[in-house]
Amino acid sequence: MGDTETRSPTRPRRPRKSRPKPETLVGYYRQMLLIRRFEERAARAYTEAKIGGYCHLNLGEEATVTGLMAALDPRDYLFTNYREHGYALARGIESRRVMAELYGRSTGVSKGWGGSMHMFDVTHRLLGGYGIVGGQLPLATGAALAIDYRGGDEVVMCTLGDGTVAIGAFHESLNIAALWNLPIVFVIINNGLGMGTTVAKSSAEPDLYQRGAAYRMESARVDGFDPVAVREAAVKAIEAARSGRPYLLEVITERLRGHSVVDPAKYRSAEEVERLKHEDPIQLFGSKLTANGLLDSDSIAAIGEEVAGIVTAAADFAASSPLPEVATLFDYTYATPVPNDSRRLPGQPLFEPLPLPAAAAAEAGVRA
């Protein structure tokens, strides 16, 4: 893994365009820092056994997440994979509800039943959070088809990891989207690694955005360390999708930790780990804003203190929130209520004899 040049493609340069207002840029920095501190607190809670299951973090991808969500209108829909905490925050969901979901509490964004990988919020049009690699692709494409069928003007954004481009659902979804001119933007979050496998070792075409050519789909690559560049590229992609031209966007980024909290990332060389320390997107963006007079040591400290308070409050809220009632386990599985025929609830031994219906019990008594 010492040959990092084969793992991460050169980050593309951003075309010169008018920059956002100063307060917007500072807002991007704050959003990125909130995601960073939130994910760090989540990692800590996981090691303290306050969070169960799997836990995948957006550490290192803060600029990518912030830029993408800054481009997406409130009316538009978002589908993500299991690395979605930062997207939920940047989409506008309260940090305490996101943290409560990680803790599995009833006050969480998915009522405590979704956990880290399955966050869902109709109000903010976040339609998952999917634990299966590529599971969001067909559903996002179907949502775009529904928009087109109803004559709506919304757009679907579907993010996926670089490890997803080799599965069948990727081809099927892009093919259908291109054939039917669906309003959808597919965003490949290329952090260079599918768990521990490099893109160069898993894809015959390492320039992943070039895969759009197979579907005659417009595509582009953008530097995921710059939230402004990401937003500009995403706006262009969304405008194309809204006019009936699906789009494939590849964002080059890095993850600062392993695939999940429990992954020690030993497949990385010491040189690569050291390089990543100097390519921290928050430090890079903060330095730019400081050089342009938009931030100074006092404002950076103030933002840091504010964000720390938000994250601490979120963790306290999650820890003090109640666990969901067992009876609500099936309440949020479907959009409409369905009969629940299950007779075994969580907490019952798997092989505990179930009570027989009255008729069967009576018949059994006769046979005895």
What are these regions (language model features)?
Residues 1-64, 71, 256-257, 265-266, ...:
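Conserved acidic/glycine
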Residues 85-86, 105-109, 185-187, 213-216, ...:
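Short, surface-exposed, polar/charged, turn-prone segments marking secondary-structure boundaries
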Residues 39, 76, 81, 162, ...:
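Acidic side chains
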Residues 82, 251-253, 333:
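A general secondary-structure junction signal
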Residues 125-320:
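Glycine-rich ThDP/TPP pyrophosphate-binding loop and its adjacent helix/strand module
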